[in-house]
C-alpha cells in the first residue's frame, strides 16, 4: 500500500505566479503537511487493524502453492528494514520441496557474500536473545497454519519498519523463526474445502502424511515408545527438523495444526498408551498450562472451550486447553520430543475446525489468531534468564546444566553461556553445573509476572574428576587438617545429626549431592556411573580423606540404595549419612577415623526412574519397583544356578562395571518391605526356599549381625507383625534362599564375581513411608550404618610383593584352606580378606611365582596385617641357562639417571590422576570448531612442519585413486634420524572417509604435542623418547565425498573405486591406498603399537576381525583395548547407546573385532600378522559424521585415552640382543609365549608390549644357540631384558665335539682297514712270484676268492687271475682275452 510520501503534489511549478506572498505560503504549507501526516497515520492504523499487515489486498483470497510460498516469504522479509530477516531452508521434503524458514530479529546484518545455503544461511546466533519457533502445516491437509505464519511474518516485518512499539520491542529482544510448511508435499495433494470430516478419498490422498505415507507427528523418538525407533530415512522432513533443533537452543515453540480449536500441551502420550483419559503430566505442567492459556485466552473461539466442531459438537475443553495424552494418546509427537530431548517448551495449537477451509475464510482465521500468536512469542521472556560464565576468564560456558529445585527437568546453556528458564511466578532455587567447575546454587530467586528475572552464574574451575577411577594412588594436595584423636578416645563432643528429613525427588537429590560436594571438597567427590533408562545420572558420592584416589592398603566400601524404586528408605538414609559424615569429619573421633581409614562410596539411588513413578505411603505395591523398561534390577544380574534371559539393563551394566573397577571389600544393598539382614546365597540349584550356604557363611553371619544388633527392632526378629504374622528371623538375620529364592540377585553376583562381600538389608515394613516418619528411620539405623562400615576392617589385610624388586603384584591370589573362595590383589599388591576370629592357613600365589603359605591367627579387634613376598619361579631356569652357555638377564633398573627419571615419569603417569594432572598442566586446550577438507588438512600439516621443523617431518606414503596424498607426520626430537632404541607408535584414521572424527582428533593430538613441546616437561620427555607417526586420513577421496551431520550415510565409506579399504589388506592388495600403507608403514615392522580411529559406535575392538578359533596374545591385545576404554569417560561402561542399537551391551567397552563385525582383509589383522604390531580400533562416536560443534566434546572424551597410549608404548619389554663379545645382533627372532614374533632392529634392540604378568621369551638367531627366559611385566613400568647369545657350534644338530670325535674315529678305522688289506695282498703276491700258476678250475673256489678279494679292492676280477709278475706281450695278451 502506498504511504503517500511518493505521491506528486497537485499543484504545478508554473502556477507559482498565482501563489500568495511568502509568509502566507509558509503557513499554508505547514497546515497541509500536518493534514497529510494525519491522513497517513490513520491509513496505516486502519491497515494494521483490519488487514493485519501491509499486504496487498489480494493476499487473503488464495493459498500459496509451490514456489509462491517462497516468494511470499521473500516479500514478507522485504517488508521490513535491511538486516531484520533471513530466509533459508532447513532441508527438503521427500519430493525435493524446500522447507522454508524465515528468521526475524533485529541486528542480523546483511546476508553473507557469496550467499550461504541451507542452515548456514540462517545467520549468526545473538547472545542472550531467546529463540522461538512456530511450525505449521505438519499435516499437509491442515493448511490454516501455513497461511497465518506468512501473514505473521509480514505483520512483524512491516510493524518493525513502521515503528510499532510492541513489535519493535519484540524483535529487538527475541529471535523468531517461522516455518510455514513442514509437509509441502502433503499440502500439494490436499484439496481446498476438505475439512477432514470423512474419508472422502483413497488412502494416502488426503495430504495428511508425507509422500511416503508417514505421519510426521508420529515419527519422532518417543520416551514411552514400545517398539523400534522410527526410521528417519522415511521422513526426511523430521530428520531436517531434528537436526535444526539440535543446532539451536530454542526456548519456546508452537506446533500449529487444524481439526479442532484448542491448545494442547505435553505429554502427548503415556507409558500405558491408553487411547484417551490419561493425564500425562510433565515436571513443568504449570508452565505448560500457563503458555497454553496465554494463547487460548486471546483467541475468540478457543477461550470459550467450546469449539463446536462438526462431528464433535459436544467436545469441550476447560479454558480452551488440554493435556495431550488426556485428549488422545499420540506416540512419536513433536512437542514431547522438544521437551524431552531439547531445551524447548512446545505446545500444539489447533487453529480451526475445518482442516482446509476455503480461501475466503483466511482473513477471519488470521484475525482470530493474530493476537494469540504475538502473545505466545512474548511469553518466551517469562521466568529466569542470565549467563553462566567462567569466573577466571569471564567467558560463557556452553552446555552448562541449569536445574531448578523441585522440578525434574534441566536445561542447558547456549553457545555464549546464556540461558532462559521458563517459569511461572514464584520463588525458586537454581543450580548451575558444568564439568570441570564447582556447582553453584542461588536460592530464593523471585519470579514475577512479566519480564524474566536476570541471574548470572560465575563458576569456579576445579580439578575434581567426575569419572570413576580405576588406577593406583598418587598423593594430591588439598587434604583437610584434622585433629589427631585416637579412635577409642571418649569425647564430650556430640555428633551433629542430619536435619534434612524429606523425600528427595531426583532434582532435589541432585542439588543435595552437589551442595555437599561443593561445601566439603576436601573429603568428597561426586561422580556418575552412567545414566538410567530415562537418562537420569546414577550418582555416587565418595567420602574419603583423599577423594578420587585409591590409597594402597586402604579398603573400599559401598552402600547402594533404592534398587527397587518404590523402596525409598535406603535412599534417604544414605543422604542422611552423607550429611552426617561430612558435618562430623574432623570433630567426631569415630567419623574422622572411619573416613581416614576407609574409602566410602555411597549410591543413594540405583533406580531413579522407578522412584519418580512411586507413591508416598506405599507398603505392598510394586508401582515403581522396576526400572523404566519394567525389569526388576535385583533379578537382572548373572546367576550361578539359573540363566538370566532378560536383557541386561543400563543400571545393571553401570553397577557391574563400577564394582569391577574398584577394589570393594564390603557392601550392603538397602531395600524395604521387611526388617532383616539377608546374606548369600540368594538362590539354589533346585529353586526352592531352603538354606543355601556360601563358603563364607560364618563371615556373612558375623557382618549381618553387626548391623542387626544395633537396630533393636530388627534384632528382635519379628518384623511386620501386622503384615506377616508367622515371619521370624532369629537375631534379625537370614540366609537369602532360606527366606525365598531370588535368582539374578546383586549380592550373590558381588560375592562370586568380585572380591566384595555384600548383604541385603531390609529397612522397614513400609516401602515408601510418609515424610514425617523419616527421622525415626534415621534414629533406628544410624548406629547400624556406622558399625556395618567398620566391618571392612576385620580379618586379614596386607600386600603381596615381588621378592626381586619389592613391587606389589597385581592379581595375585589369596586362598584360605578349607574355604573355597579366593580373593585377588589390587594394583599395589594390596588385599583384604574378611574372616571371623580363628587360625587359618593362607596361601599367596601368582602366575610365574612360587606360592607362599602362612599360618595366620585372626583376632576379633581389627584386621591383622600379613604380607607375602613371592620369588619368581623363572630364577632357577635362568641360572641353568647360564652354565657354559649364553644367557638372558631380566632387570628393571638402569644406571642412566635420565632413564631413571623417565621411568619415574611413566610410573607417575600410570598412577591415579597422573594423566589428569598432566592434562591440567598443559597449555590451554585447543579450539576445534570445524572439519578439515583435504586441502585444509594438507595446509594444516605443512603449517605444523613450518612452525615446528625440529620435531616434525611430513612425508607422503603414496597417493589415492584420485591422486590425493596420504600424509604421514612424524613427531620426534630427531624426526629424520633412526633411533631403534626408542619405541615407535602410529596413530591412523580415516580408513572410512565418512567417519572423519578420528582425523580431527589426530590433528588435535599433533597440535597439542607441538604446542606443548619445550613448554610442558611431560610432553617434552614423551616426544624426546618416542617416535610418533600420525596418518590422519587413509581414504582422502572418500572423505571429500562425505557430508557433515550425516550420521548413518555410507557416502564416502569406500574409496573412489567403491572398495572398502578395510577389506583390502591382503597379500595381493588391489587399491593404491592399501598398497601405500602396507609397503611404507606396516611392512617396515618397526612399530610397537598402532591405534586406528573409526566411527559408528563407542567401543574398542582388538584383533582379529576375521573369524578364528584362537587369538594369539589375546591377553595383551585385550589389555591394550581396555586401557583406552578405561581412560574414556563413558566407553568403559559398555553402553554406546547408539540410536540404531540402543540396547547394545559391550562389556567393558571392549570386544574382539570378529565378535562385533566379522570381515576379512582388515588393517589390524594385517598389522598383527605381517607387521608384528598390535593394533586396536577405536570407534569414537555413534554418528559417523557429527556436526563440528561436537568436536570439542569428542576431543575432551578421547584426549586422555590417546595420551595413555603414548604412555603405554613405553611399557612391556625392552630388550637388547648381543653376543658374548658385546656385538649387537640384528634381525634375531624374538618369540613370545610361543606365538608372537618380533625382530630385533639395528643395534640389536627390540620392544614388545605385553599384558602385566609373567611371559616366556625365546630368542633365535642364525649361528647362535637359542635362548629361553621368562620376564615379569609390570602395569606401570617397562621390564628390560638383555639376551646374550653363544655361538652355535653344532654340526647337523649335534655338538661340535661329538661330531669331531666320531669323525676322527671313523677316519682312523678306515685307514687301519686299508693297511690290513694292503698287507694281505702283499703276502699273497709274494707266494706267486717267478712263474706261472694254475688257474682254479672249480667254480666254488672261484666264488670264494671273489668274495674275499672284493672286501679290499675295487679292481676288476681279471687283474687277480694271473699272478706272474713278468711283463711280456704274450702274458699281456693272454690276460686281455680272458
From Swiss-Prot:
UniProt-annotated stretches for the region Disordered: 189-232, 875-898, 1039-1068, 1357-1378
KW Nucleotide-binding (keyword) present: no
Residue spans crossing the bilayer: 1298-1318
Residue numbers bearing the Phosphothreonine modification: 1366, 1368
Sequence motif Cell attachment site, residues: 162-164
UniProt keyword list: Carboxypeptidase, Cell membrane, Glycoprotein, Hydrolase, Lipoprotein, Membrane, Metal-binding, Metalloprotease, Nucleus, Palmitate, Phosphoprotein, Protease, Repeat, Signal, Transmembrane, Transmembrane helix, Zinc
UniProt domain Peptidase M14: residue ranges: 62-380, 502-792, 930-1209
Lipid addition sites, S-palmitoyl cysteine: 1315, 1319, 1321
Residue numbers on the Extracellular membrane side: 38-1297
Location of the active site: 350 (proton donor/acceptor), 762 (proton donor/acceptor)
SMART domains xrefs: Zn_pept (SM00631)
Needed co-factor(s): Zn(2+)
Catalytic reaction annotation: Releases C-terminal Arg and Lys from polypeptides
GO biological process, one term: protein processing
GO cellular component: extracellular space; membrane; nucleus; perinuclear region of cytoplasm; plasma membrane; trans-Golgi network
Glycosylation sites: 172, 217, 399, 410, 429, 522, 626, 811, 855, 867, 879, 953, 976, 1068, 1140
Keyword Transmembrane helix part of the UniProt annotation: yes
Gene Ontology MF: a single term: metallocarboxypeptidase activity
Protein name stated in the entry: Carboxypeptidase D
Amino acid at each position: 500500500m502506498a504511504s503517500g510520501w511518493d505521491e506528486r503534489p497537485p499543484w504545478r511549478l508554473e502556477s507559482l505566479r498565482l501563489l500568495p506572498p511568502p509568509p502566507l505560503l509558509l503557513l499554508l504549507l505547514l497546515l497541509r503537511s500536518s493534514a497529510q501526516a494525519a491522513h497517513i497515520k490513520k491509513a496505516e492504523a486502519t491497515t494494521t487493524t483490519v488487514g493485519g499487515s501491509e499486504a496487498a489486498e489480494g493476499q487473503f483470497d488464495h493459498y500459496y502453492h509451490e514456489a509462491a510460498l517462497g516468494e511470499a516469504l521473500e516479500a514478507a522479509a522485504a517488508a521490513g528494514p535491511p538486516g531484520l530477516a533471513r530466509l533459508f531452508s532447513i532441508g527438503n521434503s521427500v519430493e525435493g520441496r524446500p522447507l522454508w524458514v524465515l528468521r526475524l530479529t533485529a541486528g542480523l546484518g546483511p546476508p553473507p557474500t557469496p550467499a550461504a545455503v541451507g542452515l548456514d544461511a540462517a545467520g549468526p546466533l545473538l547472545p542472550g536473545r531467546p529463540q522461538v519457533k512456530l511450525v505449521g502445516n505438519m499435516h499437509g491437509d491442515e493448511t490454516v497454519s501455513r497461511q497465518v505464519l506468512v501473514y505473521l511474518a509480514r505483520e512483524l516485518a512491516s510493524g518493525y519498519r513502521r515503528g510499532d512499539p510492541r513489535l519493535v520491542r519484540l524483535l529487538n529482544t527475541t529471535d523468531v523463526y517461522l516455518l510455514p510448511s513442514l509437509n509441502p508435499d502433503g499440502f500439494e495433494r490436499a484439496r481446498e474445502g476438505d475439512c477432514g470430516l470423512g474419508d472422502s478419498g483413497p488412502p494416502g490422498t488426503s495430504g495428511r502424511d508425507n509422500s511416503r505415507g508417514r505421519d510426521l507427528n508420529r515419527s519422532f523418538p518417543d520416551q514411552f515408545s514400545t517398539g523400534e525407533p522410527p526410521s528417519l530415512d522415511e521422513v526426511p522432513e523430521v530428520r531436517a527438523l531434528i537436526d535444526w533443533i539440535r543446532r539451536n537452543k530454542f526456548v519456546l515453540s508452537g506446533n500449529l495444526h487444524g481439526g479442532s480449536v484448542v491448545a494442547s500441551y505435553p505429554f502427548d502420550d503415556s507409558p500405558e498408551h491408553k487411547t484417551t483419559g490419561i493425564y500425562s503430566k510433565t515436571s513443568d505442567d504449570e508452565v505448560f498450562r500457563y503458555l497454553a492459556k496465554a494463547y487460548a485466552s486471546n483467541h475468540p473461539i478457543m477461550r470459550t472451550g467450546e469449539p463446536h466442531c462438526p462431528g464433535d459438537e459436544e467436545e469441550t475443553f476447560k479454558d480452551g486447553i488440554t493435556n495431550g495424552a488426556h485428549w488422545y494418546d499420540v506416540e512419536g509427537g513433536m512437542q514431547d520430543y522438544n521437551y524431552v530431548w531439547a531445551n524447548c517448551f512446545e505446545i500444539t495449537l489447533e487453529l480451526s475446525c475445518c482442516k482446509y477451509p476455503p480461501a475466503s475464510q483466511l482473513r477471519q482465521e488470521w484475525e482470530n489468531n493474530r493476537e494469540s500468536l504475538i502473545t505466545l512469542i512474548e511469553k518466551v521472556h517469562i521466568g529466569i534468564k542470565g549467563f553462566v560464565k567462567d569466573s577466571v576468564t569471564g567467558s560463557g560456558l556452553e552446555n552448562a546444566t541449569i536445574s531448578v529445585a523441585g522440578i525434574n527437568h534441566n536445561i542447558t546453556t547456549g553457545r555464549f553461556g546464556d540461558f532462559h528458564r521458563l517459569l511461572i511466578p514464584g520463588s525458586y532455587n537454581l543450580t548451575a553445573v558444568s564439568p570441570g567447575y564447582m556447582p553453584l546454587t542461588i536460592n530464593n530467586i523471585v519470579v514475577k509476572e512479566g519480564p524474566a528475572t536476570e541471574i548470572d552464574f560465575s563458576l569456579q574451575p576445579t580439578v575434581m574428576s567426575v569419572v570413576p577411577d580405576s588406577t593406583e594412588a598418587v598423593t594430591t594436595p588439598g587434604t583437610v587438617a584434622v585433629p589427631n584423636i585416637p579412635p577409642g578416645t571418649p569425647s564430650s563432643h556430640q555428633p551433629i545429626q542430619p536435619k534434612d528429613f524429606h523425600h528427595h525427588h531426583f532434582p532435589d537429590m541432585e542439588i543435595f549431592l552437589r551442595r555437599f560436594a561443593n561445601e566439603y571438597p576436601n573429603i568428597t567427590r561426586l561422580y556418575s556411573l552412567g545414566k538410567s533408562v530415562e537418562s537420569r545420572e546414577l550418582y555416587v558420592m565418595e567420602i574419603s580423606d583423599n577423594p578420587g584416589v585409591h590409597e594402597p592398603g586402604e579398603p573400599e566400601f559401598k552402600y547402594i540404595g533404592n534398587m527397587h524404586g518404590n523402596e525409598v528408605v535406603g535412599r534417604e538414609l544414605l543422604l542422611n549419612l552423607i550429611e552426617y559424615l561430612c558435618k562430623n569429619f574432623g570433630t567426631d573421633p569415630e567419623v574422622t577415623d572411619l573416613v581416614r581409614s576407609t574409602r566410602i562410596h555411597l549410591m543413594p539411588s540405583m533406580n531413579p526412574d522407578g522412584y519418580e513413578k512411586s507413591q508416598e505411603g506405599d507398603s505392598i505395591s510394586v508401582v515403581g519397583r522396576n526400572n523404566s523398561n519394567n525389569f526388576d534390577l535385583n533379578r537382572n544380574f548373572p546367576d550361578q544356578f539359573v540363566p538370566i534371559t532378560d536383557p541386561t539393563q543400563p543400571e545393571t551394566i553401570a553397577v557391574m562395571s563400577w564394582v569391577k573397577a574398584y577394589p570393594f571389600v564390603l557392601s550392603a544393598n538397602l531395600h524395604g518391605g521387611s526388617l532383616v539382614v539377608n546374606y548369600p546365597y540368594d538362590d539354589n540349584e533346585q529353586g526352592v526356599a531352603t538354606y543355601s550356604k556360601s563358603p563364607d557363611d560364618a563371615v556373612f553371619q558375623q557382618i549381618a549381625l553387626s548391623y542387626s544388633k544395633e537396630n533393636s527392632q530388627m534384632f528382635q526378629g519379628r518384623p511386620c507383625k501386622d503384615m506377616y504374622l508367622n515371619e521370624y528371623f532369629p537375631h534379625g538375620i537370614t540366609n537369602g534362599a532360606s527366606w525365598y529364592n531370588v535368582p539374578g540377585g546383586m549380592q550373590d553376583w558381588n560375592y562370586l564375581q568380585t572380591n566384595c562381600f555384600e548383604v541385603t538389608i531390609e529397612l522397614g515394613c513400609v516401602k515408601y513411608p510418609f515424610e514425617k516418619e523419616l527421622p525415626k528411620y534415621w534414629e533406628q539405623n544410624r548406629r547400624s550404618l556406622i558399625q556395618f562400615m567398620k566391618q571392612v576392617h576385620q580379618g586379614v589385610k596386607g600386600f603381596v610383593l615381588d621378592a626381586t624388586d619389592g613391587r606389589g603384584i597385581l592379581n595375585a591370589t589369596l586362598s584360605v584352606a578349607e574355604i573355597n573362595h579366593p580373593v585377588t590383589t589390587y594394583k599395589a599388591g594390596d588385599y583384604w580378606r574378611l574372616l571371623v576370629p580363628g587360625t587359618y592357613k593362607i596361601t599367596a600365589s601368582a602366575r610365574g611365582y612360587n606360592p607362599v603359605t602362612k599360618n595366620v591367627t585372626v583376632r576379633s579387634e581389627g584386621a591383622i596385617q600379613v604380607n607375602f613376598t613371592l620369588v619368581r619361579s623363572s630364577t632357577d631356569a635362568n641360572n641353568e641357562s647360564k652354565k657354559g652357555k649364553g644367557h638372558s638377564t631380566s632387570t628393571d633398573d638402569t644406571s642412566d639417571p635420565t632413564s631413571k627419571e623417565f621411568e619415574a615419569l611413566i610410573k607417575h603417569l600410570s598412577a591415579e590422576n597422573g594423566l589428569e594432572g598432566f592434562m591440567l598442566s598443559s597449555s590451554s586446550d585447543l579450539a576445534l570448531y570445524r572439519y578439515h577438507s583435504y586441502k585444509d588438512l594438507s595446509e594444516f600439516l605443512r603449517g605444523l612442519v613450518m612452525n615446528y621443523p625440529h620435531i616434525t617431518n611430513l612425508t607422503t606414503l603414496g597417493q589415492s585413486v584420485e591422486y590425493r596424498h596420504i600424509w604421514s607426520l612424524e613427531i620426534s626430537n630427531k624426526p629424520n634420524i633412526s633411533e631403534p632404541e626408542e619405541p615407535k607408535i602410529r596413530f591412523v584414521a580415516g580408513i572410512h572417509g565418512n567417519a572423519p572424527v578420528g582425523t580431527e582428533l589426530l590433528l588435535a593430538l599433533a597440535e597439542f604435542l607441538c604446542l606443548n613441546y619445550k613448554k610442558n616437561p611431560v610432553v617434552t620427555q614423551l616426544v624426546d623418547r618416542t617416535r610418533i607417526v600420525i596418518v590422519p586420513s587413509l581414504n582422502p577421496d572418500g572423505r571429500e565425498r562425505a557430508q557433515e551431520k550425516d550420521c548413518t550415510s555410507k557416502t564416502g565409506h569406500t574409496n573412489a573405486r567403491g572398495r572398502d579399504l578395510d577389506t583390502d589388506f591382503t597379500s595381493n592388495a588391489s587399491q593404491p591406498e592399501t598398497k601405500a600403507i602396507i609397503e611404507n608403514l606396516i611392512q617396515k615392522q618397526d612399530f610397537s603399537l598402532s591405534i586406528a580411529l573409526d566411527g559408528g559406535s563407542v567401543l574398542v575392538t582388538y584383533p582379529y576381525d576375521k573369524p578364528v578359533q584362537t587369538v594369539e596374545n589375546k591377553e595383551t591385545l585385550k589389555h591394550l583395548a581396555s586401557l583406552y576404554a578405561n581412560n574414556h569417560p563413558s566407553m568403559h561402561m559398555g553402553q554406546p547407546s547408539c540410536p540404531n542399537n540402543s540396547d547394545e551391551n559391550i562389556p567393558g567397552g571392549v570386544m574382539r573385532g570378529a565378535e562385533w563385525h566379522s570381515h576379512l582383509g582388515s588393517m589390524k589383522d594385517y598389522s598383527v600378522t605381517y607387521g608384528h604390531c598390535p593394533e586396536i580400533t577405536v570407534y569414537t562416536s555413534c554418528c559417523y559424521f557429527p556436526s563440528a560443534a561436537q568436536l570439542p566434546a569428542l576431543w575432551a572424551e578421547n584426549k586422555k585415552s590417546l595420551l595413555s597410549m603414548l604412555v603405554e608404548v613405553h611399557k612391556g619389554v625392552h630388550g637388547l640382543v648381543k653376543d658374548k663379545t658385546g656385538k649387537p645382533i640384528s634381525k634375531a627372532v624374538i618369540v613370545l609365549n610361543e606365538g608372537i614374533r618380533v625382530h630385533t632392529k639395528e643395534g640389536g634392540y627390540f620392544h614388545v608390549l605385553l599384558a602385566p604378568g609373567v611371559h616366556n621369551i625365546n630368542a633365535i638367531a642364525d649361528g647362535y644357540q637359542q635362548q629361553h627366559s621368562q620376564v615379569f611385566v609390570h602395569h606401570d613400568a617397562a621390564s628390560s631384558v638383555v639376551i646374550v647369545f653363544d655361538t652355535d657350534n653344532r654340526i647337523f644338530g649335534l655338538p661340535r665335539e661329538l661330531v669331531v670325535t666320531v669323525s676322527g674315529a671313523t677316519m682312523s678305522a678306515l685307514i687301519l682297514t686299508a693297511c690290513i688289506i694292503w698287507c694281505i695282498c702283499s703276502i699273497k703276491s709274494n707266494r706267486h712270484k717267478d712263474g706261472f700258476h694254475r688257474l682254479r678250475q672249480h667254480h666254488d673256489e672261484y666264488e670264494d676268492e671273489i668274495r674275499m678279494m672284493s672286501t679290499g679292492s675295487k679292481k676288476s676280477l681279471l687283474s687277480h687271475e694271473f699272478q706272474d709278475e713278468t711283463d711280456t706281450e704274450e702274458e699281456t695278451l693272454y690276460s686281455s682275452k680272458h
